[in-house]
Amino acid sequence: MEQLKEKFEPLFSVLPQVKSPGYRVPFREKLKWTGIILVLYFFLAQIPLYGLSANAVDQFAQFRAVLAGNFGSILTLGIGPIVSASIILQLLVGGKILKLDLSRHEDKAFFQGLQKLLAIVFTFFEALIFVLTGSLAPSAPQFVWVLILQLTIGGILIIFLDEVVSKWGFGSGVGLFIAAGVSQEIIVGAFNPLSAPTQPGVPAGRITGFLYLLFTGQSPDFQYYVLPVLALIAVFLVVVYAESMRVEIPISMGGGKRLSRGAVGKYPLRFIYASNMPVILTSALLLNVQLLANVFQKLGYPILGTVSNGQAVDGLAYLLTAPRSIDALILDPFRVVFYAVVFIGLCVLFAWLWVEISNIGPRHVARQLYQMGMQIPGFRSSRGQFEKILKRYIPTITILGGAFVGLLAFVADLTGSLGGGTGVLLTVGIVYRLYEEIAQEQLMDMHPILRSFLGD
């Protein structure tokens, strides 16, 4: 492991990086940087790819919410390379192939450097695949490398924008870009006043179209106009309720200066313990299956399935394509069941990996609580006792939470939710966590004495 570090660390030193703040970033400054990056993201998403064919079709539209990219712009790749790099490293660390202890500063810094390097490699690799397989067809052969260069630059810009948000803003850039893209898609999908080519004169927005047909005495299609909006509302309510669910472990102060000895409180464990990361990672993994299906078909070996007009029509790639209509339950039940089992299973796997790698597993939480001088009433104060009790709860809620978000995303996709079921699920969770972080930061700015207690 030490030899690997010696080989890679010189590379990390030459990679550009966003400087970490040497002080606690105030609330207003975090808000400023988050706003600036959001404006930059929307601006870059409107810069078109020079040399792209006018007939190019978004073959990965079903993953667009998770990619947080805008097809046809320099941000077409979105956060795909970042998440793909994260998947590879999580599997390597989780499988003990890379023996890193991410609670140690040195190992965590090495992990982050390796992730950035791998994300840049994936940016070029995915740009190459998108262009050479025809997913982003050039208008002329001489524009092939021009397109690859533009996509690579856009992907690298996303990597550094994400780093700015993570260090200077609220939440993470990955979450911010997903929420921004899906929110835009929901607003346009619901209220677009322009008519679609398939229905001249009828507004393309689900709500505007429904009202137009209603007021002109026509009968709106329930499954097309109403069901996606109802599914959107249902997913929103379920996610908000699930985010508020907690398993609370009673704790008390075993001594110390900050609080009086014996003060009793509760340590909350979220039901969705791994947040929405399992869904992001699972969706990104399935996207890579579709990409590889295109590559193998281009090479003349369609081992993952046949791709026609950018869509998998058979094989494993087809089975791992999300069903987007309730009709699929009747027309292709095997595919629906197969996809559901794989999707939910992967969400559980990534939930477990994320908990271990993010240092929120029983061992790390036990050490944190013990170092704060906490104890559980009725038990002796020891790190081992903390870990033993937390092991009763954290693994269980990790598995249940991962399965829950996977099932919810699958069902929401099946109903054709406005903004995409997975996209809505991710956005609601991201915005909810962002709201909590903003509220906490504002509270600490108003009451500085709370900073030490909240661990800042």
Curated annotation (Swiss-Prot):
Cytoplasmic domain ranges by topology: 1-21, 89-109, 167-172, 247-275, 355-397, 435-456
Intramembrane segments: 60-67, 68-79, 80-88
Keyword terms of this UniProt record: Cell membrane, Membrane, Protein transport, Translocation, Transmembrane, Transmembrane helix, Transport
InterPro entries: SecY, SecY/SEC61-alpha, SecY_CS, SecY_dom_sf, Translocon_Sec61/SecY_plug_dom
Keyword Transmembrane: yes
Superkingdom, natural source: Archaea
Stretches of the chain found on the membrane's Extracellular side: 49-59, 135-141, 192-224, 298-334, 417-419
GO cellular component: plasma membrane
Family in the record: Belongs to the SecY/SEC61-alpha family.
Protein name: Protein translocase subunit SecY
Gene source species: Methanothermobacter thermautotrophicus (strain ATCC 29096 / DSM 1053 / JCM 10044 / NBRC 100330 / Delta H) (Methanobacterium thermoautotrophicum)
